[in-house]
């Protein structure tokens, strides 16, 4: 724990280098990390081999992977189920020993790093230091961010990759004075992260691919920079390669999709994909989208398995849901401002949010806690839009610009 706390401080000072107030922000981040450590001990109060749902399942698989690695099985031949996150945890178990507490502490560490990179993204977008710090602090202390990122679940890594990819993308777009080699290194790293995100959650390739395509296309049309075109081409090539390799290979084993796995071959896979599409078309799309954005409703919160029977946790989640509804309303104005401003980066980020939400609304089971967990991935991107002031300031500027002409017209009539 002390090692992770030290690393948290070091990374915080590096990301927020030369930024005012970085000392107390890092202190708050350390507090957020400690809160997660405490929560780990709470959720494992009944033992690490009996607590949790998906987290317990991944823990059991990771132990088997550790045995494979220790017996000499090469990493690329390791047998795993559900998600590549179990392999990452298995590697940790193989090196340091089976310790679910340690695995959860690492997840908590990556969760806090996500808060740093989110704050850095806000600063690079030109937000004020105060606003950027507020976004990061809110993200660090949102209850769902604590709940879903401290167990041995894959959510912590997914949230981290989402924020890191968009952070690095913004850096490539904004830092025009970088050397070509440094820009290429960032682009190659982003492409690698796209592949890793696909291994963690199979459809992430397309949510990222769509968002980055919109972002980079409009950025290229606006700036005509050759490196942006190279970046766009690299993303498209990565999406094609990963689609025909990783996605195609793992589609049949993707546990969130209902498939007949007794058959093999491309023709049967095509039939299964057609079945999935038919299932999507049979859904009430408006109701599914509404469920993804708004569930769990306040009356459904007590029935979430992870917090059922815990009055304090139920109250906290209800408060969070009310704040989430407010955040969505406020974000509408931020989104309208982004559309008026026509900023390529914000448009791409918005495309990512929309595509991720739509995919999950259509393929996720209509269960409140499932929507609650999957929706947590778009909390960080949406926080970057959660400000009504720029929109109304823009409207005010437009009115002020038009008023002199109107006043001049009135005077001419009077004369």
Question: What is each PLM-predicted segment?
Answer:
Residues 11-17, 105-126, 329-333:
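Transmembrane-helix motifs of polytopic, lipid-linked glycan transferases
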Residues 8-13, 297, 303-306, 310-343:
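Hydrophobic, aromatic-rich transmembrane alpha-helices
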Residues 46-61, 72-88, 97-98, 300, ...:
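Extracytoplasmic catalytic/substrate-binding loops of multi-pass membrane glycan-assembly enzymes
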Residues 83, 87, 96-113, 317-321:
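Loop-to-helix entry region of an early transmembrane alpha helix in multi-pass inner-membrane enzymes
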Residues 118-141:
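Transmembrane-helix signature of polytopic, membrane-embedded enzymes
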Residues 18-19, 124, 175-185, 223-227, ...:
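Membrane-interface helix-loop-helix junctions at transmembrane boundaries of multi-pass membrane enzymes
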């Amino acid at each position: 724990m002390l090692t992770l706390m030290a690393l948290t401080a070091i990374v915080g000072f590096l990301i927020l280098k030369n930024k005012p107030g970085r000392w107390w922000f890092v202190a708050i981040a350390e507090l957020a990390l400690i809160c997660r450590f405490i929560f780990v001990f709470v959720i494992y109060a009944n033992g690490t081999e009996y607590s949790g749902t998906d987290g317990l399942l991944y823990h059991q698989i990771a132990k088997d992977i550790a045995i494979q690695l220790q017996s000499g099985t090469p990493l690329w031949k390791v047998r795993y189920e559900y998600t590549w996150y179990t392999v990452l945890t298995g590697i940790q178990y193989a090196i340091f020993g089976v310790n679910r507490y340690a695995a959860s502490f690492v997840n908590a560490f990556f969760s806090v790093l996500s808060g740093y990179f989110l704050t850095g993204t806000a600063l690079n977008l030109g937000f004020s230091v105060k606003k950027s710090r507020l976004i990061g602090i809110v993200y660090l202390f949102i209850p769902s961010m604590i709940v879903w990122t401290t167990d041995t679940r894959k959510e912590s890594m997914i949230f981290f990759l989402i924020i890191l990819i968009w952070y690095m993308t913004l850096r490539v777009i904004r830092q025009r004075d970088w050397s070509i080699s440094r820009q290429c290194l960032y682009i190659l790293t982003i492409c690698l992260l796209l592949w890793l995100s696909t291994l963690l959650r199979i459809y992430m390739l397309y949510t990222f691919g769509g968002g980055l395509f919109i972002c980079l296309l409009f950025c290229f049309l606006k700036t005509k920079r050759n490196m942006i075109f190279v970046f766009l081409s690299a993303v498209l090539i990565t999406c094609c390669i990963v689609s025909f390799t990783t996605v195609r290979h793992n589609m049949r084993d993707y546990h969130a999709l209902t498939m007949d796995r007794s058959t093999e071959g491309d023709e049967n896979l095509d039939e299964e994909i057609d079945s999935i599409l038919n299932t999507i078309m049979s859904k009430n799309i408006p109701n599914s989208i509404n469920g993804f954005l708004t569930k769990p409703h306040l009356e459904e919160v007590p029935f979430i398995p992870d917090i059922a029977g815990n009055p304090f946790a139920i109250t906290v989640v209800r408060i969070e849901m009310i704040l989430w509804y407010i955040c969505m309303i406020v974000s509408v104005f931020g989104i309208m401002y982004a559309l008026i401003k026509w900023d390529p980066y914000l448009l791409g980020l918005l495309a990512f949010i929309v595509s991720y939400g739509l995919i999950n609304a259509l393929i996720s089971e209509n269960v409140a806690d499932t929507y609650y967990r999957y929706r947590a991935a778009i909390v960080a991107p949406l926080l970057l839009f959660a400000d009504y002031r720029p929109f109304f300031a823009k409207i005010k500027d437009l009115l002020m610009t038009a008023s002199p002409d109107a006043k001049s017209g009135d005077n001419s009539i009077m004369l």
